Curated annotation (Swiss-Prot):
GO terms for biological process: tRNA wobble uridine modification. The gene is cmoB. This is tRNA U34 carboxymethyltransferase. The keyword tRNA processing applies. It comes from the Bacteria.
Length: 323
């Protein structure tokens, strides 16, 4: 099973040390009581991957690992078979020793939209809420972060992260924990907190904003990326049964409304940094994610609308500070 001892040792002497009052018992209970029916199959694939240490590692312009001399075709095929056992791959892409994992999302494009607007990450302790496979954690490390911690209750994503970590030489600067933010104590210990692609899945979005705030140090920075609609500060879409075929979408505010929500929750220096329509080039079906994707979620005759008739996905990045 997954061993979290390295993470416990890492945080024992820093501002995250109070987390050790609750975290080990939480994760022990998770391993005993909450494992997904396929978890052993997924983790078996991770265990059968080779432990590789790249001679060239680029986390600044992507997540790329190479080795000189290169691994053999047979090794690459074995590695690919194990990684394919962890499909679907949604967040990436990853370039590993000549193998290209072409994920559903071009998460590197989102990173390019976010990065110019945020405070430098060098030396920072970071929390990424809803981190998925951990792609952005590695990009944060590429920007010089001291420690990047991701939380996501989806257990396949944890196994994907551990697979990538193993192929990057067992790097201990990034960690993923199988938790939701509601399971975290109020740590007030992270310099930057990211919540990207999460808010619209929350039944109580203001509670989510308070939960994010409670993880930040004083003067810490929130990076919030989420679906929005066009409109003024009073505009909020509450979809019916589904939005873009997703059942669990509750509130999609306009960017000005979201700014007002953040200010209502006590954040300051709130700014709308970026807005971008999601395209079928950024989110699409691939060889590593073979089920339906954005093209099937949009009106086939009018890509400005979802199949349900709502405005097509528009995403905003907002930056805010905890005073």
């Amino acid at each position: 099973m997954i061993e979290f001892g390295d993470f416990y040792r890492l945080i024992a002497k820093g501002p995250l040390s109070p987390w050790l009052d609750t975290l080990p018992a939480q994760l022990s209970a998770w391993q005993r009581e909450s494992l997904h029916g396929k978890f052993k199959t997924w983790f078996n694939a991770v265990e059968h991957l080779p432990q590789l240490t790249p001679t060239t590692l680029d986390l600044h312009s992507g997540v790329r690992a190479e080795m000189s001399p290169p691994i053999s075709a047979g090794q690459r095929e074995g590695m690919e078979n194990m990684l394919r056992a962890l499909m679907p791959w949604r967040k990436g892409p990853f370039s590993l020793y000549g193998l290209e994992i072409d994920t559903e999302w071009r998460s590197d494009w989102k990173w390019q939209r976010v990065l110019p607007h945020i405070s430098p990450l060098a030396g920072r302790t970071i929390l990424d809420v809803g981190c998925g496979s951990g792609y952005h954690l590695w990009r944060m490390i590429g920007e010089g972060a001291h420690l990047a911690v991701g939380i996501d209750p989806m257990q396949l994503f944890l196994c994907q992260f551990e697979a990538i970590r193993k192929l990057l030489g067992g790097d201990q600067r990034a960690h993923v924990l199988p938790l939701g933010i509601e399971q975290l104590p109020e740590l007030a210990a992270f310099d930057t907190v990211f919540s990207m692609g999460v808010l619209y899945h929350r039944r109580s979005p203001l509670d989510h904003l308070y939960q994010l705030k409670n993880q930040l140090v004083t003067d810490g920075e929130l990076v919030l990326e989420t679906l929005v609609v066009e409109g003024d500060s009073q505009q909020v879409l509450v979809p019916g049964d589904r939005y873009a075929q997703m059942r669990n979408v509750y509130f999609i505010p306009s960017a000005p409304a979201l700014k007002a929500w953040l200010e209502k929750c006590g954040f300051v220096d709130v700014r709308i940094a970026d807005m971008a329509v999601t395209t079928t080039e950024e989110q699409r079906r691939t060889d590593w994610m073979t089920s339906e994707s954005l093209a099937e979620f949009l009106d086939p005759h009018d890509h400005s609308k979802t199949v349900e008739g709502y405005p097509a996905p528009l995403r905003a990045v907002l930056i805010a500070r905890k005073p």
